[in-house]
Amino acid sequence: MAHKKGTGSTRNGRDSNSKRLGVKAYGGEPVTAGSILIRQRGTSVLPGINVGKGKDDTLFALTDGIVTFETIRRGLKNRKRISVALTS
């Protein structure tokens, strides 16, 4: 017979590192070319004018300007689109 109680196992005890997703530049904010606007998984926000999309779906500014958000109708859903308006 065991003279000390064996330790049990658990299925918990793991936690992934946060990925710091979300909006990095809000509407009306001035940005420079190359600035990250949104980090996302999938295209929950679509790229608009003067906005590029990276391979991990990150949206970034292609030119200097002011960030603008708009809602567009795409199929049966309303989607958000982010653009960078040029400053004159």
UniProtKB/Swiss-Prot annotation:
PANTHER family: LARGE RIBOSOMAL SUBUNIT PROTEIN BL27M (PTHR15893:SF0), RIBOSOMAL PROTEIN L27 (PTHR15893). The gene is rpmA. GO terms for biological process: translation. PROSITE patterns: RIBOSOMAL_L27. GO terms for cellular component: cytosolic large ribosomal subunit. This is Large ribosomal subunit protein bL27. The keyword DNA damage does not apply. Gene3D superfamilies: 2.40.50.100. It holds the Pfam family Ribosomal_L27. Residues 1-26 are annotated as: Disordered.
